[in-house]
Amino acid sequence: YQTKNQGCDPSEYLSQKWAFSIVDKCIVLEDDDVPSQSFFPFCKEMLDRYEHDERIAMISGFNEDEVTPDCEDSYFFTSTFAIWGWASWRRVVDKWEGDYAFLRDKQAMKRLQSLVRQRGYRKDFLPMCTEHQQSGKEYYESIFWASMLLNSGLAIMPSKNLVNNLGLSDNSTHFCGSIQTTPKAYRRIFTMKRHELEFPLKHPKYVVENVDFKERVYKINAWGHPFIKMSRSLEELFLNLRYGNFSSIFKAMARRCRKMIGRDKHA
């Protein structure tokens, strides 16, 4: 345990670096993650099966499809993932750059910018990494994402969702608002059903990305979809007005103003 309360960040980064310095592979659950029972044997089998496959960077438990319609196997591969219940190996965590060194590498940044643009990934990702680096803290989410991109890593995704996240409330660390004022598409993410996988697992024959899944996830999160993002913002505004949640409206307006003047690059 930490001897000093350092907050969510950099505590998560430090804790995970510590854990993976002791073991070669590990399952990670945060306090707001609720896994199904089959999450653990699934992770165990994947950790053993792909331990030495450098193409695979992590195993995710949260599937935004809930049940992926175009998958006949027990799992598939994707370049997008969630950290709501995951597992990985020391070989992956050892590549994490806690000092965000890639930001000072002109060639790496040029290729990252091209990759983010080509994939239609969230435009605020690299500015967010810069802001995290300037804070002097290690934010493991942006460090993990950057490492996946820089090393062309794939995630293993179960064909059915195995994890719920309970982290949406007025007092959340990462999210503001409540279920009733959250746009329907995002609300679904936090109320999604957990499933159990059947064993023995059915393994895919090829290690190839499920691009259709990635495109659905990007659409759900409005990455590269400005009109969807705008409609979600309007829906959230309407819901906050409907339920009299004026404080959230003022906070959102303040974030937008900070973004406009360059004080918050990824609001």
Identify the role of each PLM range.
Residues 1-29, 33-267:
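Peripheral/terminal regions associated with large enzymatic or DNA-binding modules
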